Regions:
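Short, surface-exposed loop/turn motifs that are enriched in glycine and acidic residues
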Residues: 6-14, 42-43
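Short coil/turn segments at secondary-structure boundaries
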Residues: 35-39, 107-109
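Short, charge-rich, low-complexity alpha-helical interaction segments
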Residues: 10-32, 105
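Long, compositionally biased
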Residues: 85-111
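Long, charge-rich, low-complexity intrinsically disordered regions
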Residues: 1-7, 107-110
Length: 111
């Protein structure tokens, strides 16, 4: 359930990106929305996984650490390669946090 998933975030439990997306899909209706993450601009329909996770995290008042945990192995990839250039939305969020996130529209609506 949504509450069970939220309780796991930030624990020592390793989250899977796919599980995060599945919980979002089960509990929210998604509408593609453009969003800004630090100096990265994402068009509506672009980087939908990041869009869904950031919107989900905002709706559920997750902090930066909890939000990053929702990215699962992709966040772990970034931690393993601090000088890398992949996963730009994760890397930007690590630098700017919630102050860098801005949506142009509503991406998720609770069912």
């Amino acid at each position: 359930t949504l509450n069970d998933f939220l309780a796991q975030i930030g624990e020592n439990t390793q989250l899977d990106f796919e599980d995060t997306i599945a919980v979002i899909s089960e509990n929210y209706d998604y509408t593609p929305a453009a969003f800004h993450n630090g100096d990265v601009s994402n068009e509506a329909g672009q980087n939908e996984g990041s869009c869904k996770i950031f919107a989900f995290a905002q709706l559920n008042d997750l902090n930066e650490k909890q939000t990053l945990a929702c990215f699962g192995r992709f966040y772990q990839d970034v931690l393993a390669t601090p000088e890398g250039t992949d996963h730009g939305n994760i890397r930007n969020f690590m630098n700017t946090g919630w102050s860098g996130i801005r949506f142009e529209g509503t991406a998720l609506t609770a069912r």
